[in-house]
């Protein structure tokens, strides 16, 4: 199977958060698409490089919860490309999840979000892509936090996370699962 790529815009929140902390990522670490500011909206990076850039940004910031903060403050619908814009303009959380699931592969090659709901609880399950995804901690946390924030802002619902699990390293048998519900 080929190398998995992601939208280059997925690294911009990490760069903004590092800049805001008074540090700068070494330009030699950045791919050429960042030479003149933000990359084109369709520019792609190898997933491993994206995770390495997020890890380096977190290291420079010195924050243990860098990914959560960057996901909340700096990721937007635009960070997720057309997928985020479709989710943002959905009228319901269900429509937003359906759109995000349908177009997830535009953000990360091979991605397809599976989700289930049971009354007020929605479970977002990992992709059915056979290639395992072990994101860096900070990138994984930023994506989950940003997606939750995007759903909250686009629907106006007070969504509350119940359970979030990540696979951080090979050999760990933990499913990528998120559960949240609308409080109230």
Residue locations for each model-derived region?
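N-terminal low-complexity or simple alpha-helical regulatory segments
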Residues: 1-123
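Alpha-helical bundle regulatory/interaction domains
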Residues: 90-184
């Amino acid at each position: 199977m080929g190398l998995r790529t992601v939208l280059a815009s997925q690294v911009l929140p990490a760069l903004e958060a590092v800049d805001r902390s008074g540090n700068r990522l070494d330009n030699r670490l950045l791919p050429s698409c960042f030479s003149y500011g933000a990359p084109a909206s369709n520019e792609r990076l190898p997933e491993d490089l994206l995770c390495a850039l997020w890890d380096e940004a977190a290291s420079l910031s010195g924050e243990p919860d860098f990914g959560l903060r960057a996901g909340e403050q700096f990721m937007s619908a635009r960070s997720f490309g057309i997928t985020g814009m479709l989710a943002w303009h959905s009228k319901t959380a269900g429509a937003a999840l359906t759109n995000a699931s349908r177009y997830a592969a535009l953000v990360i090659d091979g991605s397809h979000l599976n989700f289930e709901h049971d009354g007020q609880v929605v479970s977002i399950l990992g992709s059915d892509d056979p290639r395992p995804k072990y994101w860096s901690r900070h990138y994984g946390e930023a994506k989950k936090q940003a997606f939750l924030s995007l759903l909250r802002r686009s629907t106006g619902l007070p969504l509350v996370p119940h359970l979030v699990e990540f696979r951080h390293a090979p050999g760990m048998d933990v499913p990528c699962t998120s559960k949240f519900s609308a409080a109230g």
